[in-house]
């Protein structure tokens, strides 16, 4: 059986913490002129991964 590999795309996007996985918000890279200042401010920083997505990310990062 081959070695388990970490999903390199997921490894770049998610950081494991004691309370779950930390990730950046989507929709914050380009074409931001249409977006209100309030919305851009809300998308700043990081947030924790939703519990429903945790098993999938666990599988992708299983080799860590």
From Swiss-Prot:
Q: Does the keyword Ribonucleoprotein apply?
A: yes
Q: Name one GO molecular function term.
A: structural constituent of ribosome
Region Disordered: which residues?
A: 1-51
Residue intervals passing through the bilayer: none
Q: Which UniProt keywords apply?
A: Ribonucleoprotein, Ribosomal protein
Comp. bias (Basic residues): 1-28
Pfam families with a match to the protein in the record: Ribosomal_L35p
Give the GO biological process terms.
Answer: translation
**A cellular component annotation (GO) from this entry:** cytosolic large ribosomal subunit
Q: Which NCBIfam families match?
A: rpmI_bact
Q: Which family does it belong to?
A: Belongs to the bacterial ribosomal protein bL35 family.
**What is the protein name for this chain?**
Large ribosomal subunit protein bL35
Question: What organism is the protein native to?
Answer: Saccharophagus degradans (strain 2-40 / ATCC 43961 / DSM 17024)
